[in-house]
């Protein structure tokens, strides 16, 4: 077989902190059964490098994401004032409070997908408290965020205002 079609990422690494002993045991059984805890040497090296030398990159990354959050917040205030950005406290996911649009969740989803041509997380998938909300991932290049906001503003001007 052609090696390029059999790509396997060798630098995947993750951590699971599970304080509940019963849940931790069940997790361990699952991981062992699937041989999912078999680390690769490059994964270990990349984790070590990230923890040892990643501070500058992380600081730059967080500043960039904060800039995207600021951009979305200011853009919506100016171009789609009935949609409010809720600034995240510890992530790159911005909740969009769309309740002032007074749309059903179905109509809200149709507005974002069919009119703005955006695929965001439907707030209702997180429970009834999420009704009237959409969730936007801003851990993207600024040009992608700008394009998404322009699409949203264009749809807002045509269908909401």
Language model feature labels by segment:
Residues 2-9:
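Short, small-residue-biased leader/transition segments that mark boundaries at the very start
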Residues 25, 31-40, 84, 159:
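Glycine/threonine-rich helix-loop capping motifs at alpha-helix boundaries
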Residues 41-44, 48, 64-73, 85-98, ...:
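Conserved glycine-rich beta-strand-loop-beta hairpin in the small C-terminal domain of fold type I
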Residues 13, 45-49, 64, 71, ...:
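Alpha-helical elements of Rossmann-like donor-binding domains used by nucleotide-donor carbohydrate transfer enzymes
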Residues 104, 111-120, 126-161:
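PLP-dependent enzyme catalytic core of the Aspartate aminotransferase-like
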Residues 14-21:
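Short beta-strand-to-turn element immediately C-terminal to the catalytic PLP-Schiff-base lysine
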């Amino acid at each position: 077989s052609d090696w390029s079609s059999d790509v396997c990422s060798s630098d995947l690494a993750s951590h699971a902190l599970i304080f509940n002993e019963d849940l931790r045991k069940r997790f361990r059984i699952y991981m062992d059964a699937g041989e999912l805890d078999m680390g690769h040497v490059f994964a270990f090296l990349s984790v070590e490098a990230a923890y040892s030398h990643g501070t500058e990159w992380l600081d730059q990354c967080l500043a960039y994401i904060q800039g995207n959050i600021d951009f979305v917040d200011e853009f919506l205030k100016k171009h789609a004032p009935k949609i409010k950005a809720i600034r995240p406290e510890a992530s790159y996911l911005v909740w969009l409070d769309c309740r002032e649009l007074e749309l059903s969740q179905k109509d809200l989803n149709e507005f974002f997908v069919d009119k703005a041509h955006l695929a965001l997380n439907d707030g209702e998938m997180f429970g009834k408290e999420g009704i009237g909300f959409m969730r936007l991932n801003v851990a993207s290049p600024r040009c992608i965020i700008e394009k998404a906001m322009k699409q949203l503003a264009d749809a807002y001007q045509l269908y909401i205002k």
